[in-house]
Amino acid sequence: MKKLLLMLFLIPNISFALPITLNKYISKHPSWNSSDKSSFSYITSRCGILFVVISERYKNMTGGEEIYKMALTNAVIFSKVSSDTYKEMGGKTNAFQERAKKWARIYGEEGVNNIDVYGEMIHGDVKSDVSSCMDKVMPAI
């Protein structure tokens, strides 16, 4: 019985893990911030989407005004850079929108899982991606 309860506790953590963190993606694509425009667009779009999801979480939360404003500002910056890069490469709008929907769903589910398990949205892989966006990607913009 204890093993079953342990498995039930661990399954949500496994099922909502990000397919790949930005840090891992960046390490596998070393030219992301120079010649690899496709990776640059992908990374900046994920950062933009991540911050949109965070801003929505804190939008109407008491005491969350500063986080909301910061997240929204970052979402606009990353999304604009990603969109411009994607258009520059000749990418199609519908493909860009599909990628955005996919990652909004993934980050939303991961955030809800983090709240349920840890009591906060920005934890684990989400926290790792926030750090990657701010420490690695933002300086490259």
Language-model region placement:
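Helix-turn-helix repeat elements of alpha-solenoid scaffolds
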Residues: 19-25
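Sec/Tat signal peptide C-region and signal peptidase I cleavage site
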Residues: 13-19
